[in-house]
């Protein structure tokens, strides 16, 4: 196993370190199937700095709904109404959360990563299409990819049940969406990705996956 090091310059005083940990529970091309853990050390020079940890399961995340594909982990299927509001803000009060326990994992000796941390760049996508949609296939969890791809985008056939937007990132990228929307409580937001358009539409499947695939996210809005 390898670890990464990040150096930051901080003023004197108290600072907040927040980590969102996701355990896949299956073997992927990135991780073996191992028991979950979090390994973090904070230090100033050679002196280790004590960290007071608190933890809470994020109940808004549905567990193991669908795998992205057999080589990767799971689709994010999240009801944001069930997440602690504002928990990612530095001022959030987590004093009521539980304290984690130390665990031992027989993983061998940790070594520093041989590559630098992956860079994260902001990319503004280009809007290439928009309109309204209507559902025509099954329930949300039956087959998320088919439900997404088979939605009717012709407003002349069915009453509109929602809106859609199609964006172009300019090239094939490893990306993660960052959206800020003012939505009513319970509104559903689905995001799908594809390397190319199929018949002018995003097809949320990954070619050559050697199995089923769902290249998408699903969120239920808290409201606001």
Enumerate the predicted regions with their spans.
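Extracellular/oxidizing-compartment recognition motifs
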Residues: 1-224
């Amino acid at each position: 196993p390898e670890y990464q090091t990040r150096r930051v310059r901080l003023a004197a005083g108290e600072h907040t370190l927040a980590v969102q940990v996701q355990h896949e529970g299956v073997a992927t091309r990135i991780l073996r199937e191992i028991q979950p853990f979090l390994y973090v050390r904070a230090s100033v020079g050679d002196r280790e700095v004590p960290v007071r940890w608190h933890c809470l399961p994020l109940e808004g995340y549905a567990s193991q709904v669908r795998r992205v594909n057999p080589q990767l982990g799971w689709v994010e299927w999240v009801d944001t109404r069930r997440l602690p509001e504002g928990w990612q803000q530095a001022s959030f009060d987590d004093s009521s959360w539980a304290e984690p326990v130390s665990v031992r994992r027989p993983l061998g000796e940790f070594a520093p990563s041989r590559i630098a941390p992956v860079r994260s760049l902001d990319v503004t996508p280009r809007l290439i299409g928009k309109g309204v949609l209507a559902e025509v296939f099954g329930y949300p969890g039956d087959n998320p990819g088919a439900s997404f791809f088979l939605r009717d985008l012709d407003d002349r056939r069915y009453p509109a049940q929602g809106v859609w937007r199609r964006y172009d990132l300019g090239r094939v990228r490893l990306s993660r969406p960052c959206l800020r929307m003012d939505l009513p409580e319970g509104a559903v937001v689905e995001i799908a990705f594809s390397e190319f358009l199929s018949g002018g539409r995003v097809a949320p499947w990954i070619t050559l996956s050697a199995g089923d695939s769902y290249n998408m996210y699903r969120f239920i809005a808290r409201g606001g």
